[in-house]
Amino acid sequence: MAILKRGARNKTHQEPAKRGGNNIKKAAFETSKKKEVGVSDLTLLTSISDESINDNLKKRFLNGTIYTYIGHVLISVNPFRDLGIYTDAIMKSYQGKNRLEVPPHVYAISEAMYYNLKAYNENQCVIISGESGAGKTEAAKKIMEYIAATSSTHSESIGKIKDMVLATNPLLESFGCAKTLRNNNSSRHGKYLEIRFNSQFEPCAGNITNYLLEKQRVVGQITNERNFHIFYQFTKGASDNYRQTFGVQLPEQYVYTSASKCTSVDTIDDVKDFEATIKAMQVIGLAQEEQDQIFRMLAAILWIGNISFIENEEGNAQVRDTSVTDFVAYLLQVDSQSLIKALVERIVETNHGSRRGSVYHVPLNIVQATAVRDALAKAIYNNLFEWIVDRVNKSLHAYPGADKSIGILDIYGFEIFEHNSFEQICINYVNEKLQQIFIQLTLKSEQDTYAREKIQWTPIKYFDNKVVCDLIEAKRPPGIFAAMNDSVATAHADSSAADQAFAQRLSLFSSNPHFEQRQNKFVIKHYAGDVTYDVLGMTDKNKDQLQKDLVELVGTTTNAFLTTLFPNQVDKDNKRRPPTAGDKIIKSANELVETLSKAQPSYIRTIKPNQTKSPNDYDDHQVLHQVKYLGLQENVRIRRAGFAYRQGFEKFVERFYLLSPRCSYAGDYTWTGDILEAVRLILQDALIPEKEYQLGVTQVFIKTPETLFALENMRDKFWHNMAARIQRAWRRYLQRRIDAAVKIQRTIKERKEGNKFEKLRDYGTSLLGNKKERRSMSLLGYRAFMGDYLSCNESKSNGSYIKRQAGISEKVVFSFHGEALHSKFGRSAQRLKKTFILSPTTLYIIGQVRVQNAMQYTADYKINVNSILQLNMTNLQDDWVGIVLANSSMPDPLINLSFKTELITHLKTLNSKIQVKVGPTLEYQKKPGKMHSVKCQVSDTAPKYGDVYKSSTIFVRRGNPANSKSKKKPRKKSSGMSAPTTQSSKTLAPPRMSSNNQNTTVSQSLNGGMNVKPQTPASRSAKKPAPPPPGSKKPAPQPMAKKPAPHPTPQAQMQTQTQIPASQSSATQSSIPPPPPPPPSKTSEPQFEAAYDFPGSGNPSELPLMKGDIVYITKEEPSGWSLAKTLDGSKSGWVPTAYMVKHEGAKAPPPAPAVTASQPAIQNQSQPASAQTVAATSQVPASFGDGLVSALAARANKMRVESDEEAAASSDNDDDW
C-alpha cells in the first residue's frame, strides 16, 4: 500500500476568508447516499450468532437497505416494493468499481463476474438460492440487465444477441412462472442461462437449460393460486383474430384457470404482460406462424380442461358435451371420435412370450377418464415449453465465436406445503444439491484447500448435507427415488399397488437419522427444515409416461407443429423401462453440478422477510429460521478466519508480474527463476505486508479483499503510468528544444537590439541627468530593471498574497519593500515599513500589521499615476523620494526605497509629464498646500549602506560621482558545475606575482586557509577585496602568508604552476608533504579572524566585525557568506567569507624552505614577515573588487527570492541596484 505524505503545516496558517457570491454551490458528497445502518458486511459484526445476524438484517430491511455481504457472498432480503435502486444512474455508478468502493448491490456481484471474466479469462456463474418468494428471479433479471448494459457492443449482431438475452426473461416468465401463496411470480421451473462471450468479451451467444417444469399446475392449483401466467395473459389480451379462430374466452370460462378462484392479482397487469410476451417472441425471432401455433396449443389445453364426463348405463365414463371435444379436435387437427375414444377407453395388450397376445379395449370410469384428459393437457404444455426453450437456444446459437460464459442459475426455491407430493420432493432435492455445491465450494473445499496447501488454519465445524442428498438419489444402497422406481416396476399397471409397494420399501430407511416414516407419509429432514411428503399418487407421477392411446392419437394429427412437439412414436418392441421423472431430475441435477463446478462461482442468498408479501413486516422467527438453514453463521466464521483470494502460482504471476521490475521489463515477463520466487518478488515489490498473505504448496493466499483490490488497482494503472512516463520524457525533450530555441532567440535579439531591462536601466540613469551621486551597487553590470521583485504576478508567492490582500487586480509593473516617513504632531517622525506596488494606473503604498501572529496588508495610499506632478530627490546617494501630488487632500508621501531610480523610471514611462527634480534639498507637501524642505548632508558617521533621517535632515556618506557609468555586463561562466577540487600529492602553486620576490609561503597559505566547499561559479566570484597598499604600516597579527586565497580559480592555478621555477617547485615539494585525505568533521568549530573591517549594512541578520576579531564559522554558503558567532556565543550573524582567514593561534610559522636556485629567492628569504605579507597581498588580481560585487549581487538575488521575510528584506537592500 502506498504511503501518503503530508506537507508540513504552518502554525500561523489560517483558513482563507470566505468569498461572497452565490454562483458556487456548497460541495456535497453523495447526498443521495443513505446513512449506514448496521454493518454492510456481516464479517464486521462484533458478535457472531444467528440472532445478531438477524438483528442486522432487520435494521437494514426496515431502513430500505436490502443487500448485505458476507465477504463475496451477497445476502438479499426481498423488499416487496420498488426501492428505486435499479436506475441507469445507479447502474453506471457500479461500472468499473470493486465491491468495497460501492454499497452492497446485485450490480456489484454482476460487475465482479464480468471483471473476472475479462481479467482471468475464466467462466463465471452465479448461484441464486433461497426459498420461494425470496427474490431469486428478480435478482437473475437484474444481473442479466447489468451485463447486457455493461458489455461493449461493436456490431449490430452483438446488440441483437443482447436484446435476445433480455427478451428471454418476459417470455420464460410467462410460460414458466405462476402465482403461489408465497410469491406472485414464483418460478415453477428451473433454468440455467449461459451468456457466452467472444474474444472481445462481447455477448455473442446464449444457452438455456430447463429443469423440471411443474406441469401438474396446468390442470390444478390450490385455492388462491393461479395457473401459469400465459393462460391469463392470453385469455385477457388475445386479439380478435385469436378469439374467433381459437375460440378464446375470458379466464373465468375455463376450468383450468378458474377452479382456484383467483383469476386476477393486484400487482399483475396481464394485458400489459401479454404485450411484453409478444414483443419478446418477435425479438427472439419467432415467426408469426410459430406464434400462431403456440397460441393454438394454449387454446387447445384450455378447451381440453373444459371436457367433462358423466356415467353411462354401464357406469363407465362418457363425454358430457361432444361440442367441446369437437372443438378440441379442430384445434389439434385430429379426428373427433378418435379423441373421444382415447379419453374414455384404454387399450390393453397381452403378451405370451415372444408371441403377440390379445388386444382389449377397456372402458374407463370418470376418475380415470379425467386423469387421461389431464395427462394430455400436461403433455402438450410440457412439450410446448421445451420446444420454446429449444427455439430460443436456436436463436441464441446463431452467432459463432463463443469462448467464455457467465451462467445465471434461477431455479425454484425450497418448498414446504401442507400437502407435499412428488413435485416438492424433486424441487427440494435440487435445492439440497445446490446447498451441497455451496458447502463444497465455500466451506468444505476452502478448509480442504487450507489443509492441502499447509496453510495455518483453525478448522470450523459445519453441517454437510451430503447424507440427505444420498438418502434421495443413491442407488447402492438404494435411495428414495430408486425405491420408487422399483415400486413402479413391480406394480406398473396399478398405481395404488405401486404406492403401497413404495410405502413398504420406505422401511429400509428407518435407520437413517434424517428420515422418518409415518403410515402413508414420510419425513425428510432437509437443510431448510423437516418436510412431510404424501405417498399416495407419488409413483404415478414418477412414471412420467403418456398412455400409448394418447401418443397414437397425436400421431394421427395433420398439424405439423403438434407432430414436432411429440416426435417420438411408440416403440412397441422396446422392452426396456423408459426413464422415470426421478431419473430425469437426478440426471439434470448432476449435470448442473458438473456445469457449475467448471465455472468460478458467485453466490446470492435470498431471504423472504414474511409470508404476507408486505413491505413493512419483518418476521423474526421466519428469517431466523432461514439464517440457520442457509448456514450464514458458519459462512461468517469461515470468512473471518480465512482468505479472501487464492490463486495458483503460475496464474498469479501471469496476472501480476507487471508489478515487479525484477520480473518484467516493458510489459514482457523476464524472470527465469523459480515460479515461487517470482510470487515473492511480486508481493515484495508491491509492498504487501507478510501478514496479508500466505504461500501454500501450489497457491498464494491473500487474506483481505482490500489487498487484492490494491494489487488490481496497481496493475490497472501500470500501463497508464508507463504511458505517463513516456509522455513526460517526450514533453521534457520538447521543452528542452523550446527552451534552447528561446535562449538562442533571446541572445540574438539582445545582440541586435540589446536587453530591454538594461535599456530601461540606462534610460533611468539618464533621467537623473548626472545630478545625483551613485551608489556602488547601482553601477554593477548585472543590474537590470526587472520590475516585479516580489513576484506579485505569480500565482503562489508572498507578493501575490500581498496583492490579493490589498485588493489589487491589475498586472504589477514594479514591486519592492521600503519605508515611508510618518509624521506625528509634537513627536519625531517615524520610518515605517511599507510595500510599494506599481500597476499601469496606480501606485500603491501598502502598510502591514501583525494580527494573531499573521501578517495582514492594507493599501494606505492609492495614487493615480496621472496625479503625480513631481518626483523630488537630493543630489547625494540617499534613497529618499518625495512624491508631489496634484490637488490632493492628503500630505505627499516621502518614501525611502533602495530601487528608487527604477520606480522613477517606471513612473516616467507611464506618465511622461512627471517632472524629476534633483537638488541639494528635497521638497514635498507635508500638509496639503504647504511645501516642506528636507536637507541632505554628508556624514562619515552615517551607515555605510544606508542613511539617517533626523529633524528634516538626511545624513549619508559620500557616494560615487554623479557621472559614473554602469559597468558592462560580465560574461557568464559555463553553466556546468566544475569538478570538486581534490588535493593531489603535489603542492598547489602560489598565484602569479608581478615582482620577482616570490615565496613559497604563498603556496602554504593556499593549503593553510579555510576548508571551503567545492567551488561553484557563485563561490568563485566571492573573492575578498584588495588589502591596504604596500606603504601602509598596519601591523599584521601573523604573517599574511598564512592567510588563504579561499577561492582560487583553476586558470590562476594553472598559470602559477607553469611559472614557478623547477628548483622552487622541488623545494616546495620537499618542505610541504602532500596533504592527507579530508579528516572527519571535528566537534570543535574552527576559529577565523577578520582580515578587514566589516561594519555591516544595518541588517539585524549581519554580524559587524573589526579587523582582527576572532569568531567561529558554523556554516558557509556558496553565495559568498558565512554564518559566524562570537567566541562567547552571545552574538551570531552573517559575514563575508572573503573577509575571513583561518586563525592559527600561537602556532609558530613553518620554517622557510631551502632555496637551492637563484639569488632572488635568497633575497626573498631575508625579507621580514611584514614585507612578505605586502609582497603576497599586493599581487591580488585587478578583478578582485568585481568578485566582491558579484558576491553581493548573489546575496541580494537570494534576498529577493526570499521576499516573504519582511524584517530582513526591508533592511537588507544595500543600494539602488
Swiss-Prot record:
Residues 1083-1145 form the SH3 domain. Residues 37-716 form the Myosin motor domain. Residues 1-24, 956-1102, 1145-1174, 1197-1217 are annotated as: Disordered. Residues 772-962 form the TH1 domain. Its main location: cytoplasm. Residues 405-487 are annotated as: Actin-binding. GO terms for biological process: actin cortical patch localization; actin filament organization; endocytosis. ATP binds at residues 130-137. Residues 1-11, 965-974 have a biased composition (Basic residues). Pfam families: Myosin_head, Myosin_TH1, SH3_1. Keywords: Actin-binding, ATP-binding, Cytoplasm, Cytoskeleton, Hydrolase, Motor protein, Myosin, Nucleotide-binding, Phosphoprotein, Repeat, SH3 domain. Phosphorylation of the TEDS site (Ser-358) is required for the polarization of the actin cytoskeleton. Phosphorylation probably activates the myosin-I ATPase activity. Residues 994-1007, 1050-1071 have a biased composition (Low complexity). It is found in: Cytoplasm, Cytoskeleton, Actin patch. One of its GO terms (molecular function) is hydrolase activity. The modification Phosphoserine is found at residue 358. Residues 1203-1217 have a biased composition (Acidic residues). InterPro entries: Fungal_myosin-I_SH3 (IPR035535), Kinesin_motor_dom_sf (IPR036961), Myosin_head_motor_dom-like (IPR001609), Myosin_TH1 (IPR010926), MYSc_Myo1 (IPR036072), P-loop_NTPase (IPR027417), SH3-like_dom_sf (IPR036028), SH3_domain (IPR001452). Residues 720-740, 741-766 form the IQ domain. Residues 1025-1038, 1072-1081 have a biased composition (Pro residues). GO terms for cellular component: actin cortical patch; cell tip; myosin complex; plasma membrane. Belongs to the TRAFAC class myosin-kinesin ATPase superfamily. Myosin family. The myosin motor domain displays actin-stimulated ATPase activity and generates a mechanochemical force. The tail domain participates in molecular interactions that specify the role of the motor domain. It is composed of several tail homology (TH) domains, namely a putative phospholipid-binding myosin tail domain (also named TH1), an Ala- and Pro-rich domain (TH2), followed by an SH3 domain and a C-terminal acidic domain (TH3). Type-I myosin implicated in the organization of the actin cytoskeleton. Required for proper actin cytoskeleton polarization. At the cell cortex, assembles in patch-like structures together with proteins from the actin-polymerizing machinery and promotes actin assembly. Functions as actin nucleation-promoting factor (NPF) for the Arp2/3 complex. This is Myosin-5. It comes from Candida glabrata (strain ATCC 2001 / BCRC 20586 / JCM 3761 / NBRC 0622 / NRRL Y-65 / CBS 138) (Yeast). The lineage of its organism: Eukaryota, Fungi, Dikarya, Ascomycota, Saccharomycotina. The gene is MYO5.
